[in-house]
């Protein structure tokens, strides 16, 4: 079967999103069944205050974003003393002393003056039963992120961009936060120029999450590795989490892509990891990772060592047949171009998927080309 047929549904969903007043398609993998705002009549916020109100109220909502909502300057700026753990060169991020982080963890780092935009620090609260959908390439939230927390569930974030959240400053803000939640689908989202994490799942149970066909764009003038490659990618740290990463484009990063620990079962399938000056996977205690059908192109270190968690890297055709007992198929090989290796043959992870909704996987042959054309907002 040709890839243009295998991925036709995903590609068609993005093409039609320009005019569709609502969610297109359905979540694959662990967040399968999420409905967001369902059949609620679409609303079109026109101001930042209206957007915050719609996202935070208790009504099921289909919220259509047809413009840029720029939060920069809406809460003023703060000038204070921070620190420079990675040096003071022009490409290095410096850190805000949020919750005394510099004092407690970087006491020997040089002190520096920091001036940051206060709106970026605390993301917008998204309550249960919300669909946030961008119209074409128009739906942008700038200078502030989103957070699905404190028991919120059944949330869809589709076809938007979240950008420009204090990119010079660690602790300047995250793009999307999920914590103490369930059934969250992040789809065809672009994140760019973020101070801290592009996506973070916090330490409470975040349960069922799918991140699909999204672009994590790590290009930045500032990074913790001082090389123009953003370090803080995707951090999965929940206490009872099942996460599907499918069809995403992870570009120009240097670390935490993803960092997996806590008690997190991760299915990483058919993603493109491209142009990393650093490491991709970081697997800590309580991280259970099954990776198949992914492409690693120009990635220095595919998996940081030592691995404290568990990894099944779909290492060879014979071993991959063991997936059939739970998946109903063999797992797909990963592909590597000018990249490091990925070694992990812990087949015990396969049984953890029993009874779960498992995303389909395709061979990696055309994944890179397809993903570059189709992942992210408006594609």
Curated annotation (Swiss-Prot):
- Report whether Cell wall biogenesis/degradation shows up as a keyword of the record: yes
An example of a Gene Ontology BP annotation on this entry? pectin catabolic process
- Transmembrane stretches, by residue range? none
Q: Which Gene3D superfamilies match?
A: Single-stranded right-handed beta-helix, Pectin lyase-like
Glycosylated positions are: 129, 252
First and last residue of the signal peptide = 1-20
The UniProt entry's GO CC annotations, sorted and at most eight, read: extracellular region
Record-annotated disulphide pairs = 83-102, 92-226, 323-331
Decide whether keyword Calcium is in the record: no
Q: Spell out the Pfam families in the cross-references.
A: Pectate_lyase_4
Return the similarity comment: Belongs to the polysaccharide lyase 1 family.
Protein name, per record: Probable pectin lyase B
Q: Which organism is it from?
A: Aspergillus niger (strain ATCC MYA-4892 / CBS 513.88 / FGSC A1513)
């Amino acid at each position: 079967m040709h890839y243009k047929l295998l991925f036709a549904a995903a590609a068609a969903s993005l093409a039609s999103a320009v005019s569709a007043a609502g969610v297109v398609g359905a979540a694959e993998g662990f967040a399968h069944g999420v409905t967001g705002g369902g059949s609620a009549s679409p609303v079109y916020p026109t101001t930042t205050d209206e957007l915050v109100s719609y996202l935070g109220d208790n009504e099921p909502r289909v919220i259509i974003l047809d413009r840029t909502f720029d939060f920069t300057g809406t809460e003023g700026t703060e000038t204070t003393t921070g620190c420079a753990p990675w040096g003071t060169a022009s490409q290095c991020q410096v850190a805000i002393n949020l919750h005394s982080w510099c004092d407690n963890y970087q006491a020997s780092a040089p002190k520096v003056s920091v001036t940051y935009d206060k709106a970026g620090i605390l993301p917008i609260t998204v309550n249960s039963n919300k669909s946030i959908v961008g119209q074409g390439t128009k739906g942008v939230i700038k200078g502030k992120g989103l957070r699905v927390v404190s028991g919120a569930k059944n949330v869809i974030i589709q076809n938007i961009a979240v950008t420009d959240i204090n990119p010079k400053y660690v602790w300047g803000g995250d793009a999307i936060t999920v914590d103490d939640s369930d059934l969250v689908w992040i789809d065809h989202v672009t994140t760019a120029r973020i101070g801290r994490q592009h996506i973070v799942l916090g330490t409470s149970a975040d349960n069922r999450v799918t991140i699909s066909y999204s672009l994590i764009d790590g290009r930045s003038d500032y990074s913790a590795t001082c090389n123009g490659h953003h370090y803080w990618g995707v951090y999965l740290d929940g206490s009872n989490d099942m996460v599907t990463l499918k069809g995403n484009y992870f570009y120009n990063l240097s670390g935490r892509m993803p960092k997996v620990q806590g008690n997190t079962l991760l299915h990483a399938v058919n993603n493109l990891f491209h142009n990393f000056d650093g490491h991709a996977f970081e697997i800590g205690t309580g991280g259970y990772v099954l990776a198949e059908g992914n492409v690693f192109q120009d990635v220095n270190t595919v998996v940081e060592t030592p691995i404290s968690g568990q990894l099944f890297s779909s290492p060879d055709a014979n071993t991959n047949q063991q997936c059939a007992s739970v998946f109903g198929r063999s797992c797909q090989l990963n592909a590597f171009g000018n990249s490091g290796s990925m070694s992990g043959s812990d087949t015990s992870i396969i049984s953890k998927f029993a009874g779960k909704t498992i995303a389909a996987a395709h061979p990696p042959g055309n994944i890179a080309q397809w993903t570059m054309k189709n992942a992210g907002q408006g594609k």
